[in-house]
Design a protein with these regions (language model features):
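Pan-zinc metallopeptidase signature
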Residues: 155-317
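N-terminal mature-domain "stem" immediately C-terminal to a signal peptide or N-terminal signal-anchor/transmembrane
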Residues: 1-42
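Post-HExxH zinc-binding segment in Zn-dependent metallohydrolases
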Residues: 95-140, 160-185
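Active-site scaffold of zinc-dependent metalloenzymes
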Residues: 46-77
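Conserved small/polar residues in nucleotide/adenosyl-binding loops
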Residues: 346-355
Length: 355
């Protein structure tokens, strides 16, 4: 569908939504669809420029707008309208003084310990069951397992809960919009999310992506159980504001398949890093990371692998390193590098951070 026609079709679907019913006080924001050549912002067409990157919320000429790349993520109008409700909620979060953003690079630094993932899988399964069945005991079991994991791995848990707060809340709004626009598609999407938590073991190793699903299912479980929902934008994370206070102690069952998958996952990462180091030259470089694609990167020890791109800042100038790029982090740092393996780079006046 042509860009203007698609934008009009999405706008018609958005007209069907009562935004304040999706979330108290929430309202519609301007949106733009774009491809490699053109942008359509609220029915107005103009040439694309590099302010339009990814699917996110940006500040554009003094106002917050939601943007979506129809070239990278083509969707039919109903699905795209629901997705725009997600991105518009990011605009709303900024307006409400949201501050609970995760540290993406710290979120990558998950412990290379099987127990961490064993607990994570058990808590995800309990959450999925609670959402599907409305069983309050399973919700308390989920909270107990999560609290246990957080006690052993507090730093990574804190970043996960922040990511859940930002992305899970926005994705909840997306699914609530879909529930209005196409109830059958909503039911299918929710079933898919629950299946991901219970069965998609590789997703355990993609912390940021997983938080989209855990945060959404957490919100929908509270809704299913008829529990009060708290989300003070200037307060603690979504989970901390809504976790049950009577959670008991539970043990995570062993899952043999997870042990094998965990070993395979580590081996694949090690192989990727070794092949990259062998195939590309090393460039010594003391610089700060200033932009990245959080959905397409991983970290192993002091190595940060970015399949798409990485922006660094050195002596006040920003550079884009074209992916794949492998950066060597400075000892004890999540944001400073001492060099990288990469073929190409170019100077850019405006590095792009995550959205």
């Amino acid at each position: 569908m042509e860009l203007l026609s698609l934008s009009q079709a999405v706008a018609q679907q958005l007209d069907r939504l009562d935004f304040s019913a999706l979330y108290p006080g929430y309202h519609r924001f301007p949106f733009a669809l774009y491809n490699e050549e053109r942008v359509c912002l609220e029915g107005q067409l103009f040439p694309w420029d590099d302010r339009f990157l990814g699917n996110t919320s940006i500040e554009y000429e003094g106002q917050r707008i939601a943007i979506w790349s129809v070239a990278l993520d083509p969707l039919p109008p109903v699905s795209l309208a629901a997705s725009m409700a997600h991105e518009m909620f990011h605009c709303f979060q900024f307006d409400q003084g949201e501050h609970r953003f995760p540290d993406d690079l710290r979120l990558l630094n998950a412990p290379a310990e099987q127990d961490f993932y064993q607990l994570k899988l058990a808590e995800n399964c309990a959450l999925a069951i609670a959402c599907r069945t409305g069983d309050a005991a399973e919700f308390r079991r989920f909270a107990a397992l999560r609290n246990e994991r957080a006690a052993h791995f507090p730093q990574i848990a804190a970043e996960e809960w922040k990511a859940e707060t930002i992305e899970g809340m926005a994705e909840t709004v997306c699914l609530r919009a879909l529930r209005v626009l196409d109830p059958a598609q909503y039911a299918e999407a929710l079933a898919c999310y629950l299946a991901k938590l219970e069965n998609e073991l590789p997703l355990l190793f993609d912390a940021r992506r997983l938080c989209y699903y855990t945060g959404t299912v957490l919100c929908l479980t509270l809704e299913r159980l008829g529990l009060p929902f708290y989300n003070d934008f200037t307060g603690t994370t979504l989970y901390e504001q809504n976790r049950p206070t009577d959670a008991l102690c539970f043990e995570a069952p062993e899952v043999p398949a997870l042990a094998a998958l965990f070993a395979e996952h580590l081996k694949e990462q090690q192989t990727t890093l070794a092949a990259h180091r062998q195939a590309r030259p090393f460039h010594p470089c003391e610089a700060a990371i200033c932009g990245y694609d959080p959905m397409n990167m991983f970290r192993l020890d002091q190595w940060l692998y970015c399949s798409h791109f990485l922006f660094i800042r050195q002596d006040g100038a920003a550079q884009q390193l074209h992916g794949p790029v492998l950066a060597q982090l400075a000892p004890g740092s999540d944001y400073r590098i001492i060099g990288y393996y990469c073929c190409l780079l170019y100077t850019s006046p405006s590095p792009r951070d995550r959205g």
